[in-house]
Structure formats: structure tokens, C-alpha cells
Amino acid sequence: MEVPFTIPGDQVNAILYKKTKDKYLSRLSKVTMPSNNRIDALCMHFGSCGGCCWQQLPYELQLKQKEKSIQNLFKPYLNENVKWHSIIPSSPWHYRNKMELTFSSDKAGRRYLGLIMQGTRGHVFQMKECLLANGWFAQAARAIQKWWDNSDVQAYHAIKDRGSLRTLTLREGLRTGDRLVMLTVSGNPDYALTKSQLQSFVQVLRDSIELSNSDQKLSVFLRIQQIAKGRPTNFYEMLLYGPDHIREKLYLPDFNEAIQTLNFRISPSAFFQPNTEQAEKLYSQALKLADLSASHVVYDLYCGTGTLGICSAKYVKEVIGIELSRESVLDARENVKENGLSNVTIKSGDVGQVLEALSQENSLKPDVVMVDPPRIGLDAKAIKHILDLKAPKLVYISCNPKTQVMNLGPLIDGGYQLQIVQPVDQFPQTVHVENITLLTLP
């Protein structure tokens, strides 16, 4: 049974509302006797927000629970030949560099800009604070709420295809102080925002978002989400103010304990790890497990903005990154230039198709394959291509260990052996955990 907002040792009253294949889903009604480990949550929205569910659990116990969950998942593969590394902790608060808020209104006309309520399908509550992100996120949200309240612009209603405002995306470069705001609106031309409305939107942000020095930049985007029955959803982005990207730096400890500084540009919709400090630990650990050398050729699959491959470029002969998202590919190529790297090539396209093309081109075979796929994990076609590469080392980073462990079966059947499991906590106060595995061919 799953009961959100509880911890081991709590005695509670819960309301069952759904049975799935392997568990009951329920809502917490009352904690009749709290666990001795229970603490008070810090956030005023805890219990209604769908973002956090573990603020009532001390952080050291959160880490133990996450380690336990990974151990349970990987139990069929853990033996005396597999090294288990303790979970790498994170700063528990104010770690997120990106948030997406939703516009909504109720039948009475009340307007809400915030996060989705826990256990609901799209019900939004008014966000006044979020302790997982920098304080300016909530400050900007309050300013936009005021702008919206003083306008006749409507929140988008998906069923009726009416209204304009869908989401508000907030991003920052932790190391640079750059800030980005993107307003996503519907593609229904009957509800298009006017030029004056967009100008006032930008001005509100310029007035409310404080930049501490002239090197810090603010970027404001409009994104139009075009939906039509029987057709794929299309997005069109328009720069309203500032640079067309934000900048970020990663500080990675070198193998000789010096610090390697790497520069990255991030477009509004491109993927970048949402916890910057923890991304540095994640990538450093991945490079350490790969045990790279100057003769190595590295394939970085699902490379996003090229981060992992760029981090490894200094230590190897050649890096080939593969990414499907065109926007991420453009960023990745710019990031390669930004860091002055001549041994990194970014290929655009489906991983399986690009790998097939590389094999036909007789490109250099990889010594190390690194994969960081989306939550759905590797599909059967991608696994087949990875097995065909026969790389001696495979470093698999996952934001969803459940699909990662599902992928282990066919990889091990294909000849790989699991060597190391390394959990990394990217998202304190939540159940989510990142995981790195090292697999090798005998």
C-alpha cells in the first residue's frame, strides 16, 4: 500500500481509492501516532503540493530509504563480484535550477499560478514559496500572478480549447546568475496575446527580477504550443528579451585534484541536469568509474547538450555524442566550441539509426559507451546496437532505476557483467534518485 506523506513507523488512518496490479493507492487521512523519526516539514505547501513528499523525514533517513530502494531493485544482480557504493548526498534545499508552473482558473473565476496538487489531475494551488529552488523563482511567480490578475488574459482550458496561458518556466545558471523565463501559450489564434500584453509581461519581469551585476543576464521567451487532432504537437519559440540562452558552468575535480571548469549554454527547452551541484558529482563519479585513458574513444548516447561527453573529452582520444533533440544538438555543438574542444563530434538523430550509420562508415569503435537515456530507459533496438558495439565498458546513468534494472537483463544476456552500482541523490525531499552502473565485457 502507498500512503503519501507518511514515513516508516507512522500509525495512520488512510483512505483507499484505487487498486493497481501490485499495490493499493491511498490518501492520508490522519497520523494517529507519529514515528519517532518524524519531523516538521518546513514548507507551507507540504501535504498539498505534488512536488515534495519526504520533508517530514530527516535527510539522513531519506538517503537510507533511497539506498534501500536501489538495493531492492538490483537484488537479483547483487553478489560478491558487484561493488556497492554508498549514495552520494546533495544539499537538501534550494538546489533546483528549473521549475515549471501551471496557469489555471476555477469556475468562480479565481486564478492560480503554481504547482499541481498531490493526487489530482491538473488541480493547481497558488504557490507562495518553494524551498527546493532559489527565492527569485517564487518572487517572479508572484509578479506574474499580479500581472495576470490585472489583465483580461485567460488560462488555457484544454477540453474547450479556450484561453491562452499554459505554463511558466523558470531557469537559472547557478554559477553565472543568468535567469530565464518562458511563457507557454496555446496556439489558438482567437486567444493570441497582443503586442502590448507581451511588452507588459516582459516589463514586469525586468522590474521584479534583480540581477546583482552587469554580467548576469535575463532572457524572456514566448513559446506557442500548437495542438491539432491527429497531428504531433508543435512548439514555436520566440525571444522577447535578452540573450537566446543562459550560461552555466560546471566545476569538476580533475584526476590530479585540480578543478576543471567547463562552460555550457542552455536554450529554453534544452535538457540540463536540474541540480547543478549534484550534476558535478554525478559526472565526476561517472568519469571515475569509466577509468578513462588518452587512447579511449567514447560514445555518449542521449547526450543532450553534450555535458557528459564534454566533461570526458580532456581525458580521451575522441568523443562522439548522439542526440535526437535538434535544439539540444545545436546547444551541444555550441558547447563544444565554447570549451575549445577539437575531439568531440555531435551527431543528430535517433541513437539506433546514427549507430548503424557509424558502423557503415567504419568509424572508430568505442572503448567506453556512456548512456543517460530518458525515464523510459533504453528500447530494444538501442540495446541491440549497444551490444553490437561491443565496447569493453558501459557506463549507464539513469533517472529511473526501475527501467535501468529492466535494461540490465538483456545487457547481461548479451555478455556484459555488472561491476559497480552508485546511487546519487539528485532530488532531496522527493522519492526520486539517480543511479550509475558500470558494466564491462569479460
UniProtKB/Swiss-Prot annotation:
InterPro entries: MeTrfase_TrmA_AS, MeTrfase_TrmA_CS, NA-bd_OB-fold, SAM-dependent_MTases_sf, U5_MeTrfase_fam. Signal peptide: none annotated. The active site is at C399. The keyword Hydrolase does not apply. Pfam families: tRNA_U5-meth_tr. Keywords: 4Fe-4S, Iron, Iron-sulfur, Metal-binding, Methyltransferase, S-adenosyl-L-methionine, Transferase. GO terms for biological process: rRNA base methylation. Its EC number is 2.1.1.-. GO terms for molecular function: 4 iron, 4 sulfur cluster binding; metal ion binding; rRNA (uridine-C5-)-methyltransferase activity. It is an enzyme of class 2 (transferase). S-adenosyl-L-methionine binds at Q273, Y302, E323, D372. Belongs to the class I-like SAM-binding methyltransferase superfamily. RNA M5U methyltransferase family. This is Uncharacterized RNA methyltransferase pc1544. It comes from Protochlamydia amoebophila (strain UWE25).
